[in-house]
Amino acid sequence: MALVDETSIDEAGFRMSEATAGDFFALLKPRVMSLVVFTAFVGLVAAPVTINPLLAVIAILSIAIGAGASGALNMWYDADIDAVMTRTASRPVPSGRIQPHEALSFGLVLSVLSVMTLGVLVNWLSATLLAFTIFFYAVVYTMWLKRWTPQNIVIGGAAGAIPPVIGWAAVTGSVSLESIVLFLIIFLWTPPHFWALALFKSGDYERAGIPMMPNVAGHASTRRQIFAYALVLAPVGVAPWLLGYTTPFYGVAAMLLGLGFVWYAWKVLGMADDDRAMKPAKALFAYSLLYLFAIFAAYLADSVVERALAMGGA
């Protein structure tokens, strides 16, 4: 059912689309938003002090809305390239279900709402970090890096890695080494995750003119870089335990998950240049999603149990 009737709204000829609530929800990139919210929640819970439960809910909702705003602004600007990629052609803007000006307005309103709510009701450091994240993703990455350099997702990955730092700052009003380590885990995870996708979607990116690594440096070079990042990510994933932030439970879980990541990356490294099935790349892409969720779930469980034991012994 349409939210509004199609109608002329001004002399410039802008039209209100017959979009559904589901179309606007899709603008938020809910799958991406769910990972952002989860990692931010882990940062919030792992912080060494407690936060009022109501403020915690406000912080997480603000981060979620901010992440969704970034997605909406990304879809507004990328409508031209989304339209020629099979993976993204059905998105609300390129498919015509939502007008570009609606996506832009929606994204801008949510951006301001999320940042102001977080700043006024929680603290301004976390709000500033959220504002920076929205700007970095929607402007620096989407409008510049994505179409300019094969290092787009390496540099742009910083936006997706900041949420646990925002969660931490929402509780403590500061940034610590522990929150930066959580940032590094996501930052180093991002290139192999997206390059695995780019390997088996290189045709899409080629048609859209996006300089992803496989299209610029070739598949062989991309496979080597994926493996190199996996070798760095694995020990960084264990770093929170080595630095004394977690118990051995997390350390063992992170070690096993990291070894799994390296093994899948090794399989990608050994792919033949003429491999059209791309099964190792698809397997790594799927495993990388599991890895990020599992390693942060282990961190969350470790933090909750450790805090419960500390309270019990008090």
From Swiss-Prot:
Pfam families in the cross-refs: UbiA
Metabolic or biological pathway: Porphyrin-containing compound metabolism; heme O biosynthesis; heme O from protoheme: step 1/1
Keywords: Cell inner membrane, Cell membrane, Heme biosynthesis, Membrane, Transferase, Transmembrane, Transmembrane helix
Keyword hit for Kinase: no
GO molecular function annotations of the record: protoheme IX farnesyltransferase activity
Protein origin, superkingdom: Bacteria
GO biological process: heme O biosynthetic process
Membrane-crossing residue ranges in chain numbering: 32-49, 54-76, 98-118, 120-140, 153-173, 180-200, 226-246, 249-269, 285-305
Topological category with respect to the lipid bilayer: Multi-pass membrane protein
EC number: 2.5.1.141
Main location: membrane
GO cellular component: a single term: plasma membrane
Keyword flag Transmembrane: yes
Catalytic activity: heme b + (2E,6E)-farnesyl diphosphate + H2O = Fe(II)-heme o + diphosphate
Subcellular location: Cell inner membrane
Note: Carbon 2 of the heme B porphyrin ring is defined according to the Fischer nomenclature.
Function summary: Converts heme B (protoheme IX) to heme O by substitution of the vinyl group on carbon 2 of heme B porphyrin ring with a hydroxyethyl farnesyl side group.
Family: Belongs to the UbiA prenyltransferase family. Protoheme IX farnesyltransferase subfamily.
Protein name, per record: Protoheme IX farnesyltransferase 2
